[in-house]
Amino acid sequence: MSEKYIVAIDQGTTSTRAIVFDHSGSIVSTGQLEHEQIFPRAGWVEHDPMEIWRNTREVIGQALSKADITRHDVEAVGITNQRETAVVWDRTTGKPVYNAIVWQDTRTQKIVDRLAADGGVERFKPTVGLPLATYFSGTKIVWILENVDGAREKAEAGELMFGTTDTWVLWNLTGGTDGGVHVTDVTNASRTLFMDLETLQWDDEILKAFDVPRSMLPEIKSSSEVYGQVESSSLLREVPIAGILGDQQAATFGQAAFDQGESKNTYGTGNFLIFNTGTDIIHSQNGLLTTLGYKLGDQEPHYALEGSIAVTGSLVQWMRDNLGLVSSAAEIETLAATVEDNGGVYFVPAFSGLFAPYWRSDARGALVGLTRYVNKGHIARAALEATAFQTREVLDAVNADSGVDLTELKVDGGMIANNLLMQFQADILGVPVVRPVVAETTALGAAYAAGLAVGFWKDLDDLRQNWQEDSRWTPDMDDAERERQLRLWKKAVTKTFDWVDDDVQ
């Protein structure tokens, strides 16, 4: 019998990838295309959904061709995606009525304020686990309905569909206007502000408060079941699509953090630390989000606490693209290594406000502690250290909420190739940092969810055996120095507050 594979589609913030995995969870081939980041105004971030769909089809072809396989060798397709990013499209034409509004976008602050006027930002938190914030999909849908000509009328008439990018890709992959499946999974639904964490269904009272017609919304399903088959014009025609997980939940799943008390931290455009709370819903007292971890078929859902950090890897991109301090993201480590320390400089990248644990939409970025002594090496180092400091603050919140101190941190994502950052991360946390052999845990998690649904993998134990340690960094900083640096970081964070006014965005 010839070997069989799983294809994972990873629709991310900066690119779309298709990755072919074998039974051991190893990567066989990858196809990848970046898409345009559209910034129409300060604080606005958009993607073109049609470009994302074109890229999805193309990267599938790239991956199959590189692996020298056809659809007959593929058992199932899994999808993982940038969460919260909202697409609204016409049910009849299949065309978006507006660009996708990206999770980092802050244009909906006035909508947040309006909804929070009655009950504060935690108005819906007991039901959905999330504060009112520009980050989540719900307010983005409202913005489109209120600002795109004819959108409200079409939505009321049942002519518009909403989805995060998993739903957009799934709908198109399964036929689009010709029988496309309009579904999302529990993890993505838990990021809209609309899903009841206990019933795992859309909450009609909340939809009424937002004035969003229920007819726009996809059906909520588990993270691991057959949703439909790929349509007939695709290179993957008739292959079942059998797994969907939001990117951070997918990375947790790919790290085999299946049990209560296990966690991972992903270093990507932003950083996302997820702590598995098992079948318990824990409402954070420390600025974390309560979210879905995963749900396999008809089994009980697993929940999680999440610390979301808006800007980490994208700070390095900004230094490359906007300042020209480095010509590639990888160069940041070399530049940072030209100095012994940060020279007293702290960089708080509150470009989209601050997410966990502060949730300050009025914050903006600040570079503090500058003197004539400081050079670009210090600034590069401060930019890397910002990622580690923000992670430490989120980990402190997780420890406080869970009552369990984490003993080591599993890491994944693009920035974990940066050894200087990983060592500083271990130093500032005071616990070891562990990198797995397969760093593409996001795509792997989606592959696992799909493979479980079709019997490609038997059970979670089967998946646990695939996880292997690649590298480990142990702390090498004394307690006094760690406390000094944390004190200065927290002082720097306070300097970013209260910047946004009516005439300052």
Curated annotation (Swiss-Prot):
Binding site for glycerol: 83-84, 135, 247-248
Binding site for sn-glycerol 3-phosphate: 13, 83-84, 135, 247
Keyword vocabulary terms for this entry: ATP-binding, Glycerol metabolism, Kinase, Nucleotide-binding, Transferase
Keyword Ribosomal protein: no
PROSITE patterns (alphabetical): FGGY_KINASES_1, FGGY_KINASES_2
Pathway: Polyol metabolism; glycerol degradation via glycerol kinase pathway; sn-glycerol 3-phosphate from glycerol: step 1/1
Binding site for ADP: 13, 17, 269, 313, 414, 418
Protein's recorded name: Glycerol kinase
